[in-house]
Amino acid sequence: MALALSVAPTSSSLSSLLSRTPNPSPNFRTTHLNFGSQRRIYTINPLLRSFKCLQSSSRDVNASPFSISAIASSSSSSQTTELVPYKLQRLVKEFKSLTEPIDRLKWVLHYASLLPQMPESSKTESNRVMGCTARVWLDAELGQDGKMRFCADSDSDVSKGMCSCLIQVLDEASPVEVMELKTEDLAELNVGLLGGERSRVNTWYNVLVSMQKKTRRLVAEREGKVPSFEPFPSLVLTAHGIEAKGSFAQAQAKYLFPEESRVEELVNVLKEKKIGVVAHFYMDPEVQGVLTAAQKHWPHISISDSLVMADSAVTMAKAGCQFITVLGVDFMSENVRAILDQAGFEKVGVYRMSDETIGCSLADAASAPAYLNYLEAASRSPPSLHVVYINTSLETKAFAHELVPTITCTSSNVVQTILQAFAQMPELTVWYGPDSYMGANIVKLFQQMTLMTNEEIANIHPKHSLDSIKSLLPRLHYFQEGTCIVHHLFGHEVVERIKYMYCDAFLTAHLEVPGEMFSLAMEAKKREMGVVGSTQNILDFIKQKVQEAVDRNVDDHLQFVLGTESGMVTSIVAVIRSLLGSSANSKLKVEVVFPVSSDSMTKTSSDSSNSIKVGDVALPVVPGVAGGEGCSIHGGCASCPYMKMNSLSSLLKVCHKLPDLENVYGGFIAERFKRQTPQGKLIADVGCEPILHMRHFQANKELPDKLVHQVLSCESKR
């Protein structure tokens, strides 16, 4: 339902922002705010359709923490007619009039002294502002006159002063005015403070985002809207245990503590038969839980993204492993087989986990006739370079490379690959595929770079400038008919719920997600509250933020929204538990949130007496399907059905049967490509070359001469 906000025509963008805001969770109850000794309770009545200033009786500013405007100006704030932009302009003018950093710091500290004291009862976990180096609390109320009031506090005087400045601007503003202010509007307040400048910048931004989140909720409550959905399922980790919230989280959590007998069985057979295991992050949680536990007893187990899997297999072969089991989709086992052969380990057996095709929607898209047509168009436009996502078959890479010189990429190196290609060949045309969302996100990223300075662009790539970025954009193409079915699920509904409930949390997003989720995470990234990239980038980001919080050694609640396949949680939990375990006295809470479609939610019991324990995980009993995930791929859970074909039972069966002299599991073997390309070459040989080009780029930070020659040779033959 739309919020009952009536805005001027110039506020159409804000109107659309608030036009379909979901209702808050039942867990978020209306807070009655304390004003001195008097408790003021507002009834929940529908707001007027316009938040025009309604004159009300003067407040006792000495009795309320929501009174910064009255203290900071010579006249009563309830009588002011100043607009938010004018207040901000005046604040910026004050700030910029001070040229010395020490004077600006004193100015911020002066504002800190103006901030009314916040009641201790308001310094709650729900009022903490995430992403600030210091502890910051923010509370808000929506007055009966339709105006917002804020109060804040911090254990840092500098952060407190920043809060005071923002409250000076937004106190007694209408909800629309609060929502219209953007983080970019605060840019001129960012320069020249002493020490920790980047973290200080983030305080401005994160407090503003929290103000806007509270404003949304208060407006919804004032309109009398009944909450219509639960929070997304999540896992909450502390130094002392794990709590699973929601049925999907329950299903994930119950495998974090596998049966010792299963772990022992796997370790014994791996050791006995010298078997290595390479598995993708997106594995089923059951098999990941066992593999994670088994890693402590057998070193030749690797859980990683697709790029590292083949490298790990080579390392295992060098260490004496005679077999490699691959837990992933078919193009991953193909790559492992081909790279092992290239490294001279033809005798090492490679096994998949099924005798059926373990497909991938992206790999399938690259094998379709439409992709061949796309490449044929590229071949007619030399000099062209085909940048193909590593998540494609070896056959696709081989056929493509014969049509257009090709280099593979990953979600973590695709941007640098493209920038380097244009730097080495300025007249180049780049054709990326097959992931349409990633392609669109790359283009959007480069478009955002056109708003940067030359210095900022050079920090991303030293051989590029504003002119070169503008020049390359018309010559950057991407395939528009390929998507990952998992990341496709992060669409409009999920994004709207994240905006409403988790806009102040840390947001993570794989580069394959749709544009709305990409933009949301990119905005968070600007204030160091988000990451967009590969699965490994996401894992590293979470690890960094948790480590920083552990080092601060204060009570805190970090919340991460997992914008990729839910199978990542096993590796994430392992990293977080390791960091929290290093500080047994830590009061830190880390929450990992799984964005799930509302169609796939199952209500859980709120009665703690009905919970059960698995290891140190408290699992609520789920009414109905207690043993199920409570959601499915069709309902919108970020879970890949292809990856889930790699079960623990399959892994154990294959391992026990090896060396399979009777060929019982012949259908599980990752076969070598004996077929030839149209030019009569082996698919394995030609398909590996784009991968080797990428490896050269990663090692040397430039495209190999051989690839550059291939691209320019096509131009000379034109």
UniProtKB/Swiss-Prot annotation:
Pathway: Cofactor biosynthesis; NAD(+) biosynthesis; quinolinate from iminoaspartate: step 1/1. Residues 1-29 are annotated as: Disordered. It holds the Pfam family SufE. Its EC number is 2.5.1.72. It catalyses: iminosuccinate + dihydroxyacetone phosphate = quinolinate + phosphate + 2 H2O + H(+). Binds 1 [4Fe-4S] cluster per subunit. Its cofactor is [4Fe-4S] cluster. InterPro entries: Fe-S_metab-assoc_dom, NadA, NadA_sf. One of its GO terms (cellular component) is chloroplast. Residues 1-22 have a biased composition (Low complexity). Its main location: plastid. Expressed in roots, leaves, stems and flowers. One of its GO terms (molecular function) is enzyme activator activity. Keywords: 4Fe-4S, Chloroplast, Iron, Iron-sulfur, Metal-binding, Plastid, Pyridine nucleotide biosynthesis, Transferase, Transit peptide. [4Fe-4S] cluster binds at C360, C484, C640. GO terms for biological process: aerobic respiration; iron-sulfur cluster assembly; NAD biosynthetic process; positive regulation of sulfur metabolic process. Residues 1-70 form a transit peptide. Signal peptide: none annotated. Disruption phenotype: Embryonic lethality when homozygous. It is found in: Plastid, Chloroplast. Belongs to the quinolinate synthase family. Type 1 subfamily. Homodimer. Interacts in vitro with NFS2, CpNIFS3 and AO. Part of a Cys defulfurase complex. Catalyzes the condensation of iminoaspartate with dihydroxyacetone phosphate to form quinolinate. Can complement nadA-deficient E.coli mutant. Essential for the de novo synthesis of NAD. Also participates in cysteine desulfurization mediated by NFS2. Can activate the cysteine desulfurase activity of NFS2 in vitro. The highly oxygen-sensitive (4Fe-4S) cluster at its NadA domain, can be reconstituted by its own SufE domain in the presence of NFS2, cysteine and ferrous iron. This is Quinolinate synthase, chloroplastic. It comes from Arabidopsis thaliana. The lineage of its organism: Eukaryota, Viridiplantae, Streptophyta, Embryophyta, Tracheophyta.
